[in-house]
Amino acid sequence: MDQNEIETLQYYLKEYGQQAEVFAGQLELMENGRMEALAAIEALEALATSEDGTVLLQIGGGASLRAKVLEPEKVLLNIGSEVIVEKTSVDAIEYLKDRITELEASQKKVSEALEKLRAQTNEIAKRLEQGYRQAPGGSPVPHRHDHEDHDEE
């Protein structure tokens, strides 16, 4: 394996690593969205069983207020692109359940893509290791001429 092939493999290894980070970030965002939807469903269901419509409203910093929901049957939902629609509590719960199903399907696809990417990354790493062993001197570091500025002030 020549130096150019080693450098090409190193480039692909770096690129695949960056893609894996993007996929992992997407998975995290999807999981956060799924958890928020589950929490919203739980809150709507609890509100439906509340006798007087009083809820704890978190206002940040660990502080909460007791608040009375004036219209517990009317839920405002952000459906994307800053579009807000009003739905009944039951319809909102159904919408959120559908959103969870979509998120889970997307998570599965991204997880599968991430697994394929990791398999390719492992294969490239193996090929690089072979290349390093075959390279003169067995050095895993490509020969670069880095200029250090130790003498400049």
Curated annotation (Swiss-Prot):
InterPro entries xref list: PFD_alpha_archaea (IPR011599), Prefoldin (IPR009053), Prefoldin_subunit_alpha (IPR004127)
Keyword set, alphabetical order: Chaperone, Cytoplasm
Gene Ontology cellular component list: cytoplasm; prefoldin complex
Keyword Cytoplasm listed: yes
UniProt feature coiled coil, ranges: none
Annotated region described as Disordered, given as residue ranges: 126-153
Gene Ontology annotations of biological process type: protein folding
Molecular functions (GO terms): unfolded protein binding
Predominant location category: cytoplasm
Subunit and partners: Heterohexamer of two alpha and four beta subunits.
Protein's recorded name: Prefoldin subunit alpha
Organism from which the protein derives: Methanoregula boonei (strain DSM 21154 / JCM 14090 / 6A8)
